[in-house]
Amino acid sequence: MQIMVNDEAHEVSARTLAALIDELGYSGARIATALNGRFVPVTQRAETLLPDGAQVEIVAPMQGG
């Protein structure tokens, strides 16, 4: 399936947002996710299905000082 992750095209086999995070190597990382412009909390990632052509944003919190 073809999706966009952080404005880059990806061909993935994942069908859920949680599976996508694992497939892209983000498992265990503290990240925030959005699907098609809507925030998806960590508790809903496993049941959030990815449609073909989905727009996914994955961001890591930044620390500053």
For each predicted feature, which ranges?
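Ubiquitin-like/PB1-type beta-grasp interaction modules and other compact soluble beta-rich domains
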Residues: M1-G64
